């Protein structure tokens, strides 16, 4: 008898936590800029043809990745699952933008450092060329605390 009310209470608590977690997820459809803080890296990932191992002949692909301080979840895209958390975001530079050269230079200088990032147009990973669960087009990047 005692076990049934306890099980019901635990299930209700878990359902409530799940609803709360979904409400707290980042919505990539929002019109506000997306902001993140974390450590910037530029690792090599295996690309075509097999996306498995550079040493076995796959083309090396480099990507700018920000490792977040804490995992997040995201919604607003068919390739994002609000029940999944992640702590990496791939940063993209729009090469047609006027400031693309400056952004690429800043990215290179800030590898290995803690950064503050502002982005737009977030979307979930869709292909083997996407190396984090969330990809964001970079608008601004600065060393953490400088606010440039």
Language-model segments: residues:
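Bacterial N-terminal signal peptides
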Residues: 8-16
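Beta-strand/loop nucleic-acid-binding surfaces
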Residues: 77-105
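Short nucleic-acid-contacting surface segments enriched for D/E, G, S/T with interspersed K/R
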Residues: 100-117
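Bacterial N-terminal signal peptides that target proteins for export
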Residues: 1-8
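Short boundary/loop segments of OB/S1/cold-shock single-stranded nucleic-acid-binding domains
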Residues: 22-32
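Structural detector for short beta-strands of small beta-barrel domains
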Residues: 31-63, 67-74
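OB-fold/S1-family single-stranded nucleic acid-binding modules
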Residues: 125-148
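OB-fold and OB-like beta-barrel modules that bind single-stranded nucleic acids
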Residues: 37-40, 112-121
């Amino acid at each position: 008898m005692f076990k049934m009310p306890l099980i019901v209470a635990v299930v209700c608590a878990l359902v409530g936590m799940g609803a709360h977690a979904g409400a707290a997820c980042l919505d990539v459809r929002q019109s506000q800029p997306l902001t993140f803080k974390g450590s910037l890296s530029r690792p090599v990932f295996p690309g075509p043809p097999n996306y498995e191992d550079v040493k076995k002949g796959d083309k090396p692909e480099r990507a700018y990745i920000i490792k977040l301080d804490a995992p997040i979840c995201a919604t607003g895209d068919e390739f994002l699952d609000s029940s999944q958390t992640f702590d990496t975001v791939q940063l993209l530079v729009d090469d047609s933008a006027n400031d693309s050269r400056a952004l690429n230079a800043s990215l290179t200088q800030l590898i290995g450092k803690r950064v503050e990032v502002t982005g737009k147009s977030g979307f979930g990973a869709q292909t083997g060329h996407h190396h984090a669960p969330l990809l964001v087009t970079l608008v601004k990047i600065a060393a953490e605390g400088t606010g440039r």
